[in-house]
Amino acid sequence: MAIGFDEHQPLHTFQEVVGLKQPLFAQKLILCFAFHSVFICSFLNLRSSSINILSLENFRFSTIHYFSSMIITKTPFRISFVGGGSDLESFFSKKKGAVLSTTIDKYMYISTHEFFERDKIRCKYSQTETVNNVDELQHPILRTVLKDFDVKGIEVSSIADIPGGTGMGSSSSFTVGLLHNINAYTDHEVTKESLGAGACRVEIDLLGEPIGKQDQYAAAYGGLNIIEFHPDGSVQVEPVDISQETRAELNANLKLYYIGNQRSASKILAEQKKNTSQEDKFKALEKMVDLVYDLKEVLVKGDLDAFGDLLHQNWLLKQSLAKGITTPRINDLYAAATQAGARGGKLLGAGGGGFMLFYVDADKHSDVDAAMAELDATPFEFKMETEGSKIIHVES
């Protein structure tokens, strides 16, 4: 990109020349000056202190060329084993909630790059939007985050390994990855805690989504964790330390199947939130929280037969929380898998569709695969991951 200027026009600082309100991450300029017909070029960093071009009395400013940075973040999706629903404020404001979850090696990738048209914003996801004003963006998370950071002249793109609405916390992985990226783009340092809290602020406080807090913290921290939600609103993340043998068994024997029927979690969660005031629903959530600590114990011991049983108990409780969590097809799939040898399982996410997870002993894999194939459920390979959201590329 090149911007031409009248060589006789008075100029002040480089920031004023480019019209930037804040420094960009690792932004560099090549500045070319004419001095008695000889061009002198030098590299300067925009983040350095302002320089008054007028003090260079014998020089004439010619052209600025942008060599801007590209930043890419990689943020994992999550699988929640037990406790889902207790991360809603309607529950944890009255009694501590908890979930036990892991992130997996499927990711949301967010890239940012300076946009050619400095007075516009371009966002590419399942659609492409190019707007003059951030308020014109249709994507609510992009609109909220970019407005919050007051950035313009930026191009944001997203690519995901898994589609949204499938029960793996894709919206929160998007939000965490976007916050991580834009903080880097604007030269702000972040922690895992600030990413989790920031994503909750965007999705729950600013956008008013009727969702819980587990997905945001899972994506930010990564790994196998108990995530606790306290009545004062604070969140605590406790890693679950398991042996390499247990981790290998989980990676080998956790079976994931895509059953289709992508859905919006918001409707089901809104009903679940409303139902929390009912005594039987509240007690079901209390039992699910208890299962979190039971599951931690069996994982630490390496008792994975009991792990499957606890998944089954959690699924029975979860179905009672709201209509729409399960469907006749989901019930048929669950019955087919358990009859073929699965020790236990669950539907991922709020309910209605997406992915089903089962724990299956090695000698029963082919039987369960065959049973699920008969009902048009597609196996999906994955492994547990440990890193959480991270920056994987910076190009100056």
Where are the language model's segments positioned?
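N-terminal basic, low-structured, amphipathic or hydrophobic segments
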Residues: 4, 38, 46-51, 61
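Short, often N-terminal, low-complexity regions
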Residues: 3, 10, 18, 22-24, ...
